[in-house]
Amino acid sequence: MKPQKSLRARAMDILSRQELSRIGLKRKLAPHAESEEELENVLNEFAERNWQSDLRYAEAYIRSKSRKHGSLRLKQALAQQGIDEETSRNLLPDRSSEKLAAIAVLRKKFKHPAADLKEKQKQARFLAYRGFDADTVQTALKHAWDDGWEEDC
């Protein structure tokens, strides 16, 4: 039988594989902690030593998801992980990058422009579900199949 790992060793193993927010790390460690105080001590130590950083987690998350998702969805996901709104707002891509991402996502999913209103609504719902705001959705639907669409954003 394997000996039980200490909470500190578990945290180190988890963070060596992936960046996590404080809340995410707490969720993973909670079942193994003997007390809330022990868990908080480990979390505080890791934060002080900069082994766990909410800012680093937010940067990595946005970098990996911003090509497929809009700022609304990214903000919501970061808020669920305990990242404050100001931090997430500062890290989110600018409006033109978001519009280019929406156009790229739209062109990848739908190979041709909408033929009728029903198809256009389907495309708009798809982008809205991905977290793009109404202005970005309208811009993407308008310019996605135009030549030189990059300059219009």
UniProtKB/Swiss-Prot annotation:
Q: Quick check: keyword Cytoplasm in the entry?
A: yes
Bilayer-spanning residue ranges: none
Gene3D superfamilies, alphabetized: Winged helix-like DNA-binding domain superfamily/Winged helix DNA-binding domain
Where found, per UniProt? Cytoplasm
What is the superkingdom listed in this entry's lineage? Bacteria
Question: Mind listing the GO biological process terms from this record?
Answer: regulation of DNA repair
Its cellular-component GO annotations read: cytoplasm
Keyword annotations for this protein, in alphabetical order, are: Cytoplasm
| Pfam families reported for this sequence | RecX_HTH2, RecX_HTH3
**Matches recorded under InterPro entries:** RecX_HTH_2nd, RecX_HTH_3rd, Regulatory_RecX, WH-like_DNA-bd_sf
The answer on whether this UniProt entry bears the keyword Cytoplasm reads yes
Q: Which family does it belong to?
A: Belongs to the RecX family.
Q: Which NCBIfam families match?
A: PRK00117.2-5 (NF001055)
Q: What does this protein do?
A: Modulates RecA activity.
Q: What is this protein called?
A: Regulatory protein RecX
